[in-house]
Amino acid sequence: MDAITIWGCHNGQASAETAPLLGIRGTPKGKIVRAVTVSAYGASPVVMDLPTPAAGPGQVLIKLAAAGMNPMDVTLASGEWRPEPATFPMVLGVDGAGIVDALGEGAARFSLGDRIFGQLLISPIGSAGTYAEYVAVTAEAPLALVPPGLDLVGAAAVPTIGGSGLTLVESLEPLEEQTVLVIGAGGGVGSFAIQYAVIAGARVIANVRASAEERVRSYGVAQTIDDTTVPVGETVRRGHRDGVDVLIDLVSDAESFASLASLVRPGGTAVSTRYVADARALSASGVRGVNFVLRETSEVLERVAKDLLDGRIVAPPITRISLDQVPSTMRAGSRHRSEGKMVIVL
């Protein structure tokens, strides 16, 4: 086998020692790719050179064109979420889209040259991330063909936010004539969730910053509240004395979520995507507490893509950044609530 470089870090970039690399059909043997990694939980993200991954049995090698950024990526890198098993250096990123560059033995689901997208949370965590130029994953992962009419940047943006918005709302149906309060409505998941809730017949109250208010109103919400100018609780109680039927909270910590859940009527439901809902405590006031976890499937990806192409759903605005901008963007993202969707163009 040939000797090529492995990673060692200085000045935010990679340097090298030697290690073996197998040749990959469709990819030059010995090729080095760039990726964003952390060396340990809580370490600063850096751009590194890594050996190109190989497509093992049952795997596809994807030459990524774009990767969607998610709050989960910051949570993982910081160590706030520590799934097991994990490996370091940990390649970050879950959502991506690109071209099938190589096929491992027995990987018959896709063909070379196919445009595919999906959510690639692979065990051990960190062994395959989308903040990289290439990724090798099992062909049975939540992947789907990118339909004609949807570009790869747009496809990379939607796996987590579109899948979450669709399946979260469907888990709460029927929602017809229900009042749904969405906290963090201007972000990616919020943009999809409020649109699917409106389609389901809900009256949506969207907590959103002024900069995104016009866009969110265009989705058909009944009311918007900017919590930087007026208190959400006071505003909601004034218009809904008996409480709202459903709370969907995409951003709050445990303390803030518990306070907002007091706005839900007895018999209603309070959902957290940050896993901070205390179901036992909420049940004491007659509220069902739910910690939502996305279980992505290829079918969900196909449905979201079709809804986008049919104009049934409108994607949030995309901000494009380069791989080199990711470390600083992640640091800023840990301090600020984002609006729309950020995508790394590779």
Positions of predicted regions on the chain:
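C-terminal hydrophobic helical "lid"/dimerization subdomain
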Residues: 4-7, 11-33, 301-346
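A short N-terminal beta-strand-loop micro-motif at the entrance of redox/enzyme domains
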Residues: 5-12, 17-31, 40-65, 87-91, ...
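Glycine-rich beta-strand-centered segment in the early N-terminal region that forms part
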Residues: 51-69, 80-123
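Conserved beta-strand positions in the Rossmann-like core of class I SAM-dependent methyltransferases
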Residues: 101, 205-207, 271
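NAD(P)H dinucleotide-binding glycine-rich loop of Rossmann-like/cofactor-binding domains
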Residues: 109, 119-184
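Mid-domain Rossmann-like dinucleotide-binding core that forms the NAD(H)/NADP(H) cofactor-binding site
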Residues: 156-229
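Short amphipathic alpha-helix with an adjacent loop that forms part of the alpha/beta core around
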Residues: 231-242
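Glycine-rich phosphate-binding loop and adjacent beta-alpha segment
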Residues: 253-313, 346
